[in-house]
Amino acid sequence: NKGGVGKTATVQSLASGIVRLNHNLRVLVIDLDPQCNLSSLFGVRDNEYDNIYNAMCKQSGVPVYKCKNGVYAVPGSAQMENIEQHLPGGPSLREQMKSYTVLLGCLQDNDCHDMTGEGLKNVFDDFDYIFIDCPPALSKNTYNALVAASKILIPVQMEALSVKGVSEVLSVMDEVKEFHMNDNLELLGLLPVMVDERTKITKQLSKLLGEKHGDLILPCRIRRSVKFLEAQAHGQSIFEYAPYSSTGIDYEIAIKRMFNIKI
């Protein structure tokens, strides 16, 4: 839940990597972050009307675009910063919980706002994988994502605030399950990202993360590399820019282990 932990880059890399490994799989990304960095990376930013904000406010089908690398995307909006005032809700817990189910309702809508010309109707039925990029701060946007999701992946950068934030995210996940907002929600695991194994602080924080959440850490990590930073600067995924860099290799290994992708 901390900005800069590599969550957006991880969503981009996982989605692009899955399509690269198996072109028959259909992958959708949804941008809930008001910063709209994911939308920028996939070239669907600045859609003033056809975005997730308007879909959630109107509680209608979501607009789906097809990007150049074969991934599909639902654009975000800077207005997501203020969406809480437009969601249903009230003082009671039951009324509050109603505001957490808006995204799920949009995704279940059989009148998907298809911008691809492919006849899309229902997001859940039309895609094999759906990735939701959440905002850095815990908010109703986060709850909406967790209520709609089947699994949660927590990217963890080897920085003190990122490691500390893991417990907060796990607490929110437990709350969603405790109040039966999504009984099927599962933790996919913690994914160490932007790892520089040469530094002392990385070794110290890796040890701390292992002591606190050792059984939750995935058996893979994503190393930091210059090629990855260059790819981001060029608005490309690591698989488009440098698939055989250390970061590209790490993401491919992570994808195969997490999703059991058949090539």
Identify what each model region corresponds to.
Residues N1-I263:
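P-loop NTP-binding core
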